[in-house]
Amino acid sequence: MSLALVSSMAVSAGNLEKAVDRSNLDTSVAPGENFYQYACGGWMKANPLDPQYARFGTFDQLAENSREQLKNLIMNLGDNHAKGSIEQKVNDLFKMGLDSVRLNREGNAPLKADIAKIQQLGRNGASAAIAWLHNGIANPFFESAVMADLKNSSVNLFYLCQGGLGLGDRDYYLENDANTVKVRNAYAKYVEQVLKLAGYKGGDAKKASASVMKIETELARVAMSREEQRDYSKQYNIYTVAQLKSDYPNIDWDAYFGGLGLNNVDKVCVMQPKSIAKVNELMKSLNDKELRDYLVFNYVSSAANYLSDDFVQADFDMFSKTLSGKKTMQPRWKRSLSVPNNLLGEAVGQLYVAKYFPPESKKKMQELVNNLRVALGEHIANLSWMSPKTKVNALVKLNSFTVKIGYPDKWRDYSAVSIDAANSYWDNVKGAKQFEAQFQYSQLGKPVDKDRWQMTPQTVNAYYDPSTNEICFPAAILQPPYFDPKADDASNYGAIGVVIGHEMTHGFDDQGRNFDQNGNMVDWWTADDAAKFQKLADRLGAQYSAVVVADTVHANGQFTMGENIADHGGLRVSYSAFKKTEQGKGNTPIDGFTPDQRFYLSYANVWAANITKEEILRRTKIDPHSLGVNRVNVAIRNLDSFFNAFGIKAGDKMYREPADRVIIW
């Protein structure tokens, strides 16, 4: 690659927005003492945690901005739209969520017909009932999906995966520390409470709760850990339908596939065979009442947020208050807005982009992406630990990346979704969920559509998809503090530049490195290079695992490995790209800070946040991303340029000896 390919976003200093917001800083702390506190402490003090949040940071501020934009958009749609139009569907779904009087009047009535159907089930109907719930409503016992074949990314494959855990992670059922026991006990009470609200009598609800806990604990005992799930090679287990029926005969697979509307399943990837074997065992050992109660609970719990206030409160108390430490519920308009935003996502996105996404942002992002791609290519070419053979393969993959910016070129068709205000809120939500699930299942037998997006344009996030070898940056993240055409290069490269580098590096993290340029799970590494990579990754993981996040709980560097590698690579690559800009080549201070200092301050400010202790513990269990403080303080201590920028030396708390610094990408 030629350096001539690099284009600059440099802007003359006289035309820049403020490069560093000094109010974000806590100058009572030295950068070498605690850089995160120095860079973000002022922001944290000025933005105490609102009780409706378990975590709130600059990332969430941008999400709030996007939410306000969507609110204004939908509120201004008006009521006079042709029935069946996108505007009618979005508007009606939003307004149904606002109608608390109607929701409270209806109570549990929207559930009764479906519960009655489940309660009438005999054992022979259980597999069809599971399929009905898997059609977008709930995931009892296990989960299923249609996605690209891990080893043939151009075709779709049917997958069976572990599931059925209402608490979302096996550790909540198996560990016995004080916080986990508290959560588990609260969950058992929640199961009992929502079943009572759904119409169960007190004693029956208590017995049903015990059955649910028994079933979910059994499923948890055989579930793969989150660390184990990072290794896709151990989860690619292909079965013919005949083998599926032979190995797991207590599940009526014909009824299950038929319930999903599929008659063309010829092979299945069973990602966690032990979990499906346990379901097969439970389908025989459970009595009819236990089976029905578990299915009813899954149905009711999934519906709770779309019903009367007592259901919504029960859900909040369990999953937001107990699990995350939130003190108060979000206002109704925010909760109502999230429903069309999630269920009619691209329809809302089409309206959002037309109003809020300036075309020039796409051009600037394309320049940045190109600069980052060049920088990562140079890093790969210059790696001392990687052989020429593997480097060639890595560069082929890098140069094959598909880049998606802003919004899709073609939009989803929601004409088959019916939103009718004459029906209950839950019935409308259920119908939209079923539509989405049917769309996903209907992809079986079709080529993978590589033009599809996995996120909506109004989502404040970005992603890398190994099956398509693509990086995607939705419109909503292309706003300050991540991206601002008026900001100086240091600010943009420290924020959105690192995000771009982060997503690119995911193609070469502990999971992404196992996929080739076409998105197929192929080993393109020499054995020696793979061993060297693993040694470096383990050293990086150990840095994070050494950190105590709360009480005596440590971060899990193995579980967060991919995100940590991506943060580390994103920082290094974006810094290199920044140093090729005119501003990066110079040393002109703005607001009293050098370009390198502004780069690192910009990066840290992206992760400024306040967070509850409960949310720290929850995220440590279930989130593959490190906490914001560690995404800053651990990651940057591997970069020589950080120490040089702030004059950090031996004896400072932030200092890390050169021999202990890790360079992967």
Annotate each PLM feature.
Residues 63, 212, 247-250, 269-273, ...:
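Intrinsically disordered, low-complexity linker/terminal regions across diverse proteins
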